[in-house]
A protein has these predicted regions:
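Conserved N-terminal subdomain of the carbohydrate kinase-like
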Residues: 1-84
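Anion (oxyanion) recognition and catalysis
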Residues: 3, 102-106, 136
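Hydrophobic beta-strand scaffold residues
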Residues: 9, 111-112, 143
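Active-site beta-loop-alpha junctions enriched in small/polar residues
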Residues: 54, 85, 116-120, 147-149
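Short, small-residue-enriched loops and turns at beta-alpha junctions
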Residues: 58-59, 88-89, 119-122, 151
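Active-site glycine-rich loop that binds ribose-phosphate moieties when present
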Residues: 60-68, 95-99, 126-131, 170-174
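Surface-exposed amphipathic alpha-helices with a cationic face
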Residues: 98-105, 180
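Conserved phosphate/ATP/ADP-binding segment of small-molecule kinases
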Residues: 107, 121-182
Length: 182
């Protein structure tokens, strides 16, 4: 369906159900695409989103599974981006993200990272901090808000809640300087 719609699938790793090779699953197809289901709220009942990522195929990718030389050397990709959801899906994806960012940096490729912390993906914030800080160390352009910097990396602003905006902004800028230095 992707190819029929004109989407370039050259870099997609296809998983098979023949139980042969590194990207294989059993005949039952226990690997699947991750899906999100959102229940619409009504009245005082808020909406709720459920994520089904437990057996998502991308969770199985790890270091060495993607031809990074082809991407960054042969094809000359100039911008590499990853995000906090992918990096926290599994220990393998975390290691792949670090490998990806390092390889991009070796080739002078601009590297960006969207913190995009989701507690439903990794509820252990200390674990998330450790993984994300390794990736941030390899990043040129970091995307996040105050909550992301706190939840994904463990950085807090020194401003008390309810302070004037200018005071909060100064404290936020100070926190960003610490993140950049670290």
């Amino acid at each position: 369906q992707l190819r029929e719609a004109g989407v370039d699938t050259t870099h997609i790793t296809w998983f098979s159900t023949d139980a042969k090779g590194p990207f294989s699953t059993d005949a039952k197809g226990t690997l699947m695409n991750g899906i999100n289901v959102t229940y619409r709220g009504k009245g005082v009942i808020p909406s709720k989103t459920e994520y089904y990522r437990a057996h998502t195929a991308v969770r199985e990718l790890g270091p060495g599974d993607v031809d990074l030389d082809k991407i960054f050397v042969s094809e000359g990709v100039r911008w590499a981006h990853t995000g906090g959801i992918f990096t926290l899906l599994s220990p393998k994806t975390a290691e792949l993200a670090v490998e990806f960012m390092k390889k991009a940096g070796e080739q002078g490729t601009l590297r960006s990272f969207d913190l995009n912390y989701r507690s439903k993906v990794e509820p252990d914030k200390q674990k998330a901090h450790g993984i994300n800080r390794r990736i941030v160390a390899e990043t040129d352009f970091l995307v996040g808000n105050q909550g992301d910097f706190s939840d994904a990396l463990g950085y807090e602003t020194a401003a008390e809640k309810g302070v004037p905006f200018e005071e909060w902004l100064d404290a936020y800028a100070d926190m960003l300087r610490v993140v950049a230095k670290d």
